[in-house]
């Protein structure tokens, strides 16, 4: 699959409104329709099935891309990058995982947009290393929980994010002086589309563009990783984890012991092993 094969290759700033109207005209898929296409692609490699999955989800990419408008980057480019992420997700989507494509694809869409933002945010190249990128998209979440950092809190955040304390301090100082982009209004076009020619850069310490991005990304990203990790476990381990941790009506060790005809201690051991495997699987995704 290549971007040249589908309408997403035609996204430009001038034609963005028309593009959005076009992608919104593609019908959304029911769960059964989606699974049928996904199985045809996954098991038979049918390109037309891939096309159907992609076209029906282009509107979702536009929705996600709008959440990144605070960076002052062209919306058409954000959509274009998100479409690349969608195509990668469709290529990797396994219909047997048990989640809808939209839940699986959100991680890939946002990952591509993240890379674009980090490569092209013109005002401040805030994150260049892997550790800095992790901090860039996660530090604000920690700051909202902890407030201003003292030395002990820096150690806590560094441990949570798997980086050095000095890197936390450096990124905190960068984010404290984050730049904001301001564009002069276009008198001929009062739409809310993002201008591609910012004319003034001002420092605004109250600006928090990373907050909006983090809020939209974190939950979907975590849920997607959990679903993929669960799928890596055997059927019994999956059931134990779901019954003990994810179901609304959580089962006791004794409940599961009676179900599987083993002791409660054996279920506890299986649960412990499953959680260990789950943690390792999440870390690898």
UniProtKB/Swiss-Prot annotation:
This is RNA polymerase sigma factor RpoH. It is found in: Cytoplasm. InterPro entries: RNA_pol_sigma-70_dom, RNA_pol_sigma70, RNA_pol_sigma70_r1_2, RNA_pol_sigma70_r2, RNA_pol_sigma70_r4, RNA_pol_sigma_r2, RNA_pol_sigma_r3/r4-like, RNA_pol_sigma_RpoH_proteobac. Keywords: Cytoplasm, DNA-binding, Sigma factor, Stress response, Transcription, Transcription regulation. A motif (Interaction with polymerase core subunit RpoC) lies at residues 77-80. Residues 229-280 are annotated as: Sigma-70 factor domain-4. Interacts with the RNA polymerase core enzyme. Sigma factors are initiation factors that promote the attachment of RNA polymerase to specific initiation sites and are then released. This sigma factor is involved in regulation of expression of heat shock genes. Its main location: cytoplasm. Residues 253-272 bind DNA. It comes from Vibrio vulnificus (strain CMCP6). GO terms for cellular component: cytoplasm.
């Amino acid at each position: 699959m290549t971007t040249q094969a589908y309408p997403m290759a035609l996204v430009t700033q001038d034609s963005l409104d028309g593009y959005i109207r076009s992608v919104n005209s593609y019908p959304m898929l029911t769960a059964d329709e989606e699974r049928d296409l996904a199985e045809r692609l996954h098991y038979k490699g049918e390109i037309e099935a891939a096309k159907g999955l992609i076209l029906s989800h282009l509107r979702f990419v536009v929705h996600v891309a709008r959440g990144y408008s605070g960076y002052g980057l062209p919306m058409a480019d954000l959509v274009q990058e998100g479409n690349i992420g969608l195509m990668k997700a469709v290529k990797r989507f396994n219909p047997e995982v048990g989640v809808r494509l939209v839940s699986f694809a959100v991680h890939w869409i946002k990952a591509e947009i993240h890379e674009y933002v980090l490569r092209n945010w013109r005002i401040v190249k805030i994150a260049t290393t892997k550790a800095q990128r992790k901090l860039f998209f996660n530090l604000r979440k920690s700051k909202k929980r902890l407030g201003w950092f003292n030395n002990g809190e820096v150690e806590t955040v560094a441990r949570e994010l798997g980086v050095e304390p000095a890197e936390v301090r450096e990124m905190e100082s960068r984010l404290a002086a984050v730049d904001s982009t301001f564009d002069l209004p276009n008198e001929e076009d009062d739409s809310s589309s993002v201008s591609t020619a910012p004319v003034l850069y001002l420092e605004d310490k109250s600006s928090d563009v990373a907050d909006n991005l983090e809020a939209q990304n974190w939950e979907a990203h975590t849920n997607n990783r959990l679903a993929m990790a669960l799928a890596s476990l055997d059927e019994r381990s999956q059931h134990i984890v779901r019954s003990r941790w994810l179901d609304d009506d959580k089962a006791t060790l004794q409940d599961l012991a009676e179900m599987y005809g083993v002791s409660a201690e054996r279920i506890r051991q299986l649960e412990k092993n499953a959680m260990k495997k789950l943690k390792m699987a999440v870390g690898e995704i």
